[in-house]
Amino acid sequence: MAINPPVDATQTPEWAALQKHYDELQVEGVSLKKWFAEDAERVEKLSFDAGDLHFDLSKNLIKPETLQLFANLAKAVKLDERTKAMYTGVHINNTEDRAVLHTALRRPVEDEGKYIVDGQDTVKDVRETLDKIYAFADDVRSGKWTGVTGRKIETVVNIGIGGSDLGPVMVYEALKPYADAGISARYISNIDPNDLAEKTKGLDPETTLFIIVSKTFTTLETLTNAREARTWLLEELTANGAIAEGDEAQKAEAIKKHFVAVSTNLEKVEEFGIDPNNAFGFWNWVGGRYSVDSAVGTSLAVVFGPARFEEFLHGFHEIDEYFANTPFEKNVVVLLGMLNVWYRNFFKVASHAVLPYDQYLHRFPAYLQQLTMESNGKSVRWDGTPVTSETGEIFWGEPGTNGQHAFYQLIHQGTQLIPADFIAFVNTPNPTKDGDQDVHELFLGNYFAQTKALAFGKTADEVRAEGTPEEIVPARVFSGNRPTTSIFGVALTPFALGELIALYEHITFVEGTVWGLDSYDQWGVELGKQLAKQITPAISQDDDALAAQDASTQSLIKFYRANREF
């Protein structure tokens, strides 16, 4: 099925209406303090619930009537049609001619037979793969699957890169309180030898299981690390007498007991030494940055168990259904996507902070960097024509309260407008008291205070009233009107985390639809990879390859050659 050209949002009456609205707000003067005072129902009008998550949009630079303008633009760019196309398997990944079906990864078994794409019953295939993963996970967790010496697995080491690493490591860190089988995980991604050296430090080879995650089983970084991990395992097992030196049969058995794969290239998997029966597949309609709930999450199923992984999937599906079935005017996923467009294209902001007030989410901003920036960091629309507006945002952040003592200064008093998402949960798995003070409430006090300070600021008169010397007053004034969205959950459970990830997946899709982007390809990573293959021979031995480089690259390589010590 051919994909229609994107609607040029900037040429629609709905875009013009938003521009007029923006201009009127600038003339009126944007003042959250004033808007709150004038409308006692502002918070109610700008608050939403989706699944277990609560959203407060009232501290954003919008009025309640802005939401209808957002919805109108979403309709104008045919968001509903593109959403239906994505959910039903139309090849909306135009440049790679692929369906985009991460939503199928979390559909319930009752949906088998309902989503046939390219002749494939997607839900049935997903459930069969999950059953295989769950059986494997149960075997590892119970001790039925052991290492080559018969000892229970205690550590799984995931080797992947990009979406094969960022998603699993983020979820592992986020859900650590749910690890209940005495199994921990480590994640190796960087081809830098330091990564593997540090991640294998202190590991017992007899109780370590490696999961190699590469759909094609040809990814340079992943396969390099996999081979190094295989060498490490065999050397360590030989050194401690677990296998006999030079015994190739024992080595082959050790690899089979200590390595499994997430890949569809069974020939390459077998060449590596992994039993192809211990390979878990996924499909070309699953993009890497949308794959944590596929077989890419096998390490998570092992650590947390199949039941928890199912809860995780249910959270995704909750938001999938909400997004697809809620009218745009009340659909907080759509509205948040449009809010990002509002700031990017009308306020001309380029940066978006994600500030989780939960230490377990410390890798969430890094995860969102790939999800959002690899998806929408593009200057060409899905039909090959240039974009007609700014696209993409720089996503970044750190957990509170750490960020408060690092970069919040810029958000509060800098010259840039930086919209920020504040994420927190009512309950903690680690309740603590400092005397009579509940420490989690002390923590959440900062969550509430920061959005209030950013919204309403502090005037010069308020600063003077504190007895501040006049010459210092300007430095202590806070302008306010710094926009934030508060996202509040009951607890950081597997279900809630699935909801949170799906939320941002669909926000990214909404933005990409407005901008006319194929949010599911990533050609920007290719050129550097191609050049690296050409340049690598020049680094140590090939003078002809060196001579073929530009002057700057030659100079850098010569510096390397002159100073290498190993």
From Swiss-Prot:
Pfam families: PGI. The keyword Cytoplasm applies. The active site is at E374, H405, K529. Pathway: Carbohydrate biosynthesis; gluconeogenesis; Carbohydrate degradation; glycolysis; D-glyceraldehyde 3-phosphate and glycerone phosphate from D-glucose: step 2/4. InterPro entries: G6P_Isomerase, G6P_Isomerase_C, Phosphoglucose_isomerase_CS, SIS_dom_sf, SIS_PGI_1, SIS_PGI_2. Coiled coil: none annotated. PANTHER family: GLUCOSE-6-PHOSPHATE ISOMERASE. This is Glucose-6-phosphate isomerase. The gene is pgi.
